[in-house]
């Protein structure tokens, strides 16, 4: 899935998160989020400072169900971390690996491609 984001605003990610049985995981079952950001054309190069950047659930503005099997997560996370932009270059596609931890501490992971404006 591709999401276009501004480098100076909050961002939204549309995600389908299921457990091993295919049951939809609800936003209330998500206790933590970790993301790893790398440039899509150089996937082995992690953007400095963002290996396992944490977004607590307090940084989630909302989670709206957009279909039977997907929620749109709107993060209020500041796009700057330690005074560095989360997505530092305009017009670049980043590969974002999302790791979700449920209420039992079980991790779920999936890729999201982020196109900066």
Model-derived regions: residue spans:
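Contiguous segments within soluble domain cores/interaction surfaces
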Residues: 1-117
């Amino acid at each position: 899935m591709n999401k276009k984001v501004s480098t100076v605003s909050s961002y939204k990610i549309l995600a389908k998160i299921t457990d091993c049985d295919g049951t939809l995981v609800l936003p209330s079952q998500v206790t933590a989020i970790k993301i790893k950001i790398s440039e899509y054309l150089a996937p082995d190069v992690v953007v400095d400072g963002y290996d396992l950047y944490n977004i607590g659930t307090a940084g989630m503005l909302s989670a709206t169900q957009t279909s039977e099997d997907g929620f749109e997560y709107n993060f209020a996370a500041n796009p700057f971390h330690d005074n560095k932009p989360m997505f530092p270059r305009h017009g670049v596609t980043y590969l974002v690996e999302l790791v979700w931890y449920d209420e039992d501490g079980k991790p779920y992971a999936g890729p999201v491609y982020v196109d900066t404006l």
